[in-house]
């Protein structure tokens, strides 16, 4: 059984091993694979594992030996799952491996804004505190989370983890979700999308990317938000219209934008968000803690093992 990993570096730059996979077959690892290389590298594989290498219908048609695609991530929009099913290829993902890490990054971004961490670190380096007349130095207000309203769009594993952390900060938590109110904890208020937009001091996105959620936050919806609102996106870049967000920041119609994801990755250096001082952007690292990648690595092998035993798990194209 030949197992080919097409873009192994992001999930495993060398601090993990593949011994669990190697017990299941011949493993070939490529750090990165371009569009021009993917067919040649995957043509003899029974199993391919990938993170962000695109597998569209045209590519899959050139891989008649392929039996299984293991996506080394939770999102599975990199694979045409309908075409894969038509071709008899099972596709699996890795749910919930990064829940704690992504929730942690969500609050790292929020606290970076509310506590002005970057600003005051730089001010210290510029000796502003050293030459200050008072025992402390601050020139711009900080914000306490207790009593503020956190709005959550998407109340899956990560959204619920974020909600629980917010509760510990003393925040009021509301959510726009398809879940019934009776299935939610009593301390989470279910509201409409417009209600969430209008009342949230901080709005955080944890939705999957789909036709319905593409540019969920656009010019029209930003106009419904508070001018001081903090928008957080650790879900998928295209959930927001980045041009509209950049303009809202520039026009002071949005307090801050915090994101670990962007519409194009790697992003263009011309992206207008890079010009906005109230845009706090990290390079898609929320999932990448050692602990989360270790869980990912183990679950990838578990998915492959289950497939080989005839009882596939975490299938996204049943």
Feature names for model-found ranges:
Residues 31, 72-73, 89-100, 177:
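Short beta->alpha connector loops at strand-helix junctions that form conserved
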Residues 55-61, 179-272:
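Rossmann-like adenosine-cofactor binding region
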């Amino acid at each position: 059984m030949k197992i080919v990993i097409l873009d192994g570096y992001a999930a495993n730059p060398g601090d993990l091993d593949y011994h669990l996979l190697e017990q299941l077959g011949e493993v070939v690892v490529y750090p990165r694979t371009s569009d021009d290389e993917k067919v040649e590298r995957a043509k003899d594989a029974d199993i391919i594992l990938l993170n962000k290498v695109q597998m569209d219908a045209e590519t899959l048609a050139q891989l008649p030996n392929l039996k299984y695609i293991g996506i080394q991530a939770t999102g599975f929009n990199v694979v045409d799952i309908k075409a894969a099913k038509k071709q008899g290829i099972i596709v699996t993902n890795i749910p919930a491996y990064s829940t704690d890490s992504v929730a942690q990054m969500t609050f790292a971004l929020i606290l970076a804004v509310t506590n002005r961490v970057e600003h005051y670190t730089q001010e210290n380096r510029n000796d502003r505190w050293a030459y200050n007349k008072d025992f402390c130095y601050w020139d711009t207000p900080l914000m306490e989370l207790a009593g503020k309203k956190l709005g959550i769009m998407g109340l899956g594993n990560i959204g619920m983890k974020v909600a629980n952390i917010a509760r510990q900060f003393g925040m009021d938590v509301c959510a726009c979700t398809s879940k019934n109110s009776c299935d939610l904890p009593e301390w989470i208020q279910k509201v409409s999308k417009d209600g969430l937009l209008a009342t949230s001091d901080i709005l955080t996105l944890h939705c999957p990317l789909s036709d319905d959620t593409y540019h969920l936050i656009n010019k029209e919806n930003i106009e419904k938000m508070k001018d001081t609102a903090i928008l957080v996106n650790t879900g998928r870049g295209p959930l927001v219209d980045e041009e509209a967000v950049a303009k809202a920041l520039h026009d002071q119609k949005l307090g801050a934008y915090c994101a670990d994801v962007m519409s194009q990755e790697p992003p263009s250096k011309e992206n207008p968000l890079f010009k906005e001082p109230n845009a706090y952007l990290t390079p898609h690292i929320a999932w990448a803690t050692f602990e989360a990648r270790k869980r990912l690595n183990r679950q990838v092998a578990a998915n492959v093992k289950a497939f080989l035993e005839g009882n596939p798990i975490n299938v996204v194209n049943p």
